[in-house]
C-alpha cells in the first residue's frame, strides 16, 4: 500500500473514513451513522481531487486475480452448486449494533429454534452438503445447532465474525482480536477449527484480508468480482487465497424483506435462482447461493428452495459440495497445493 494512500486515509475523519471503506454499501453507511454528504464540501478528500496514485492504491487493495474455475468439478461434473447459510440469528437482530429490543431478538431465536432444524432436515433429506457460516455468538447462544449440523457428517461450519460486527468500522487490532476469538469459540463448540471465512455485511476493511491470511483460512467468501472462483490479489500480490464470490441477487435477505419494498413472491425468487443456475450450468462454472435460516426457513419461503433443488437435480453433471470441498478442489486443479 502506498504512503500517499496511508497518509490520506489517516487525515480523513472517522465518519468519512468509514464511508470510504464502505464504498457504497448502504448497510455499512447506516451502521456507521453516516448521512449523505454529496452536497457538502469534502475539501482535500473530494474524490474528484484525488491523485492517480491514491485512486489506484485504493482500488488495488484487494482485487480479483487469476480465474480458478476448473475444467471440471469432482466426478467430472460441469457445474458446482454451493449452498451456504449465514446463521446470524440474534446477532443481526440487534446484538451487532447494541440496539437491544425483545421483538427483533425473538426473530433471531426463530432462526435457531425453528428455521435451522427445518433447513438442515431438507438438506439431509436431499443429500446436499452445505456450509453454515456462524457469527460466534450465534453458536454460543445455541450450541446445540452444531450437533444438528454435524450429525450427518456432510456439512461444514465456517466463521462469520464474532457478533456480526461491522468490521469496516473497526481498527485493525480490534478486528483481528474479534475474528481470532470467533475462530477459537467455534472450534471449542464444534471440535473443528473453521477453514472458511465470510465477512459480516460482505465487506472488507483495509486490514481484513491480511488478518484472514494471518489466521490461515483456506478460503474467503465475501466479495463480488466474478461469479467463478478466483485468487485474491492484495496490493498487486497474488495471495494464494481462494475467493468463492457472492452476489446480492443470490442472497435471500434482500429479496424477502416483508417490511420494505423489496419483497418478492417466493416462487418468483425460485425462478430467478433457477435462471442463475441454468446459466452457470451452461457456462460450466459455479452456482453459489447465500441464505439465512431465519429468512429462508419460513414455511412459504423454503418452498422456493425445495423447488430449486428439485430443478438442479434434474440436470446432469451437477456436483453439490461444501465451500471447503470446492476450495480444496480448485486449489488442487490450479496446482496451488
Labelled PLM ranges:
Residues 43-196, 201-244, 267-289, 297-337:
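Catalytic alpha-helical scaffold of carbohydrate-active enzymes acting on polysaccharides/glycoconjugates
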Residues 294:
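Substrate-binding clefts and catalytic carboxylate motifs of secreted carbohydrate-active enzymes
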Residues 35-44:
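C-terminal segment of N-terminal export signals and the immediately downstream linker at the start
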Residues 1-14:
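N-terminal secretory signal peptides that target proteins for export/translocation
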Residues 16-20:
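N-terminal export leaders
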Residues 242-260:
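Glycine-rich, positively charged active-site loop/lid region within alpha/beta enzyme cores that binds
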